[in-house]
């Protein structure tokens, strides 16, 4: 059994152990600045992953998106052009969860401290951490600049959105026998056709105004019976708060 993670580098895909389902397939172009907490993680060459602004100086993302140097781009809609109001801030600290497992993607969560605080406005704002875990069938919003097709590559300039429900723990485990830990949940449509995928990794799953998930991994994007798998943010509230307080 092998899962694969796919990172896009200038149009080329590099397969690594573990599969990252980090794009939006079957979604729609988000209305401009509908998702003001969404950030793009840039490696100096291109967009690599998504993330979420949770305070004026901290971003939440996936641990498998880690790079030694990252620039956080806020207030973006079209990531290929400057539209006005964007803020580009280098990362000061990039902190992966100490128990992150790159083989199983358990604890796939990371915090990024910005070198300077973001200026909060209508284009750049924070998303709330959850007060409790999301319930089955909760409707959530997933967003990102990832691949928009299941086969091949078609990466959008404009931020894409997808509304999808949280699936039951039993159906999630049935879709991925032996691979789902208590720190993961599935979201999407078992019939396929709509999903997150390559390029959306690290991005937000927001339910009722709270960030409940981080785009983590999956099988072939939008494949029947293989929904996207997300990091369960509600399990990490203490770690998030302690890490921010200590850094």
From Swiss-Prot:
Quote the catalytic activity from the record. Answer: Preferential cleavage: Arg-|-Xaa, Lys-|-Xaa
Top-level class of the enzyme under EC nomenclature: hydrolase
Q: Which UniProt keywords apply?
A: Autocatalytic cleavage, Calcium, Digestion, Disulfide bond, Hydrolase, Metal-binding, Protease, Secreted, Serine protease, Signal, Zymogen
Coiled-coil stretches: none
- Kindly provide the PTM information from the record: Proteolytically cleaved and activated by an autocatalytic mechanism. Cleavage by CTRC inhibits autoactivation.
| Signal peptide stretch | 1-15
List its EC numbers: 3.4.21.4
Using the chain's own numbering, where are the disulfide bonds?
Answer: 30-161, 49-65, 133-234, 140-207, 172-186, 197-221
Q: Which cofactor does it need?
A: Ca(2+)
Q: Which Gene3D superfamilies does the UniProt entry name for this protein?
A: Trypsin-like serine proteases
**Would the keyword Zinc be found if you checked this record's keyword annotation?**
no
PANTHER family per the UniProt record, alphabetical: RIKEN CDNA 1810009J06 GENE-RELATED (PTHR24264:SF13), TRYPSIN-RELATED (PTHR24264)
Family, per entry? Belongs to the peptidase S1 family.
- The protein's name in its UniProt record: Trypsin-4
Protein species of origin:
Rattus norvegicus
Q: What is the lineage of its organism?
A: Eukaryota, Metazoa, Chordata, Craniata, Vertebrata
């Amino acid at each position: 059994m092998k899962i694969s993670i796919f990172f896009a580098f200038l149009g080329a895909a590099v397969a690594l152990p573990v599969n990252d389902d980090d794009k939006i397939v079957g979604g729609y172009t988000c209305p401009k600045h509908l998702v003001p907490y969404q950030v793009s993680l840039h490696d100096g060459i291109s967009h690599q992953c998504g993330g979420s602004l949770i305070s004026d100086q901290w971003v939440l993302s996936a641990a498998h998106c880690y790079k030694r140097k990252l620039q956080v781009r806020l207030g973006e809609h079209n990531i290929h052009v400057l539209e006005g109001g964007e803020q580009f801030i280098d990362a000061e600290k990039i902190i992966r969860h100490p128990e992150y497992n790159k083989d199983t993607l358990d604890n796939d969560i990371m915090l990024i401290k910005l070198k300077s605080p973001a200026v909060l406005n209508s284009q750049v704002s924070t998303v709330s951490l959850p007060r409790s875990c999301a319930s089955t069938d909760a409707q959530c919003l997933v967003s990102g600049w990832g691949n928009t097709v299941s086969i091949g590559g078609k990466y959008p300039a404009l931020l894409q959105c997808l509304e999808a429900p949280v699936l039951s723990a039993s159906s999630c485990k049935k879709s991925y026998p032996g691979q789902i830990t208590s720190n993961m949940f599935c979201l999407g449509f078992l019939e396929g056709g709509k999903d997150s995928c390559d390029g959306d990794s690290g991005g937000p799953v927001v339910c009722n105004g709270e960030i409940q998930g981080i785009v983590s991994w999956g099988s072939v994007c939008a494949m029947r019976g293989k929904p996207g798998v997300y990091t369960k943010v509600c399990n990490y509230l203490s770690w998030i708060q302690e890490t921010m307080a200590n850094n």
